[in-house]
């Protein structure tokens, strides 16, 4: 398991510099080792806390929280009204009203998209073929072993 604090610390290292935060953004991180990382990631809107103002830094991060953070880092924001009916749907992600529904769909479906009129949210235009990443890695290793290229 990886904690919410550990994941925030990893993500905050993608930033070029930290934020100067005078007051913690969550009520339960004042003496935590990852306090600055958590504040930095929250300032960029990459992570969120809970409605009661806490972050729960030592709680194990969920799949939904992790993919939401990764999507935020990559600035990938799907619009539920513009997903494609033919996308892969997961048995444990069928509740379209769940806060994480779009984030899971974004992270698990390869697709092309458009951003219209400066919109922040993606309109999916087509699904891409799922790649066999294990086979691609094997081909890459073999090609580089002999000085060739893959793709």
Predicted regions: what is each one?
Residues 1-5, 13-36, 47-64, 74-151:
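Feature responds to low-complexity, polar/acidic, surface-exposed segments characteristic
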């Amino acid at each position: 398991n990886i904690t919410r604090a550990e994941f925030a610390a990893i993500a905050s290292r993608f930033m070029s510099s930290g934020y100067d935060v005078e007051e913690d953004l969550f009520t339960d991180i004042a003496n935590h080792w990852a306090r600055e990382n958590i504040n930095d990631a929250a300032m960029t809107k990459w992570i969120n806390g809970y409605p009661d103002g806490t972050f729960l830094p030592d709680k194990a991060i969920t799949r939904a929280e992790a993919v939401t953070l990764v999507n935020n880092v990559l600035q990938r924001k799907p619009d539920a009204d513009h997903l494609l009916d033919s996308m892969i749907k997961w048995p444990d992600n069928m509740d379209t009203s769940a806060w994480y529904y779009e984030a899971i769909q974004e992270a698990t479906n390869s697709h092309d998209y458009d951003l219209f009129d400066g919109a922040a949210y993606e309109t999916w235009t087509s699904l891409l073929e799922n790649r066999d990443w294990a086979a691609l890695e094997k081909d890459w290793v073999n090609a580089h072993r002999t000085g060739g290229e893959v793709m």
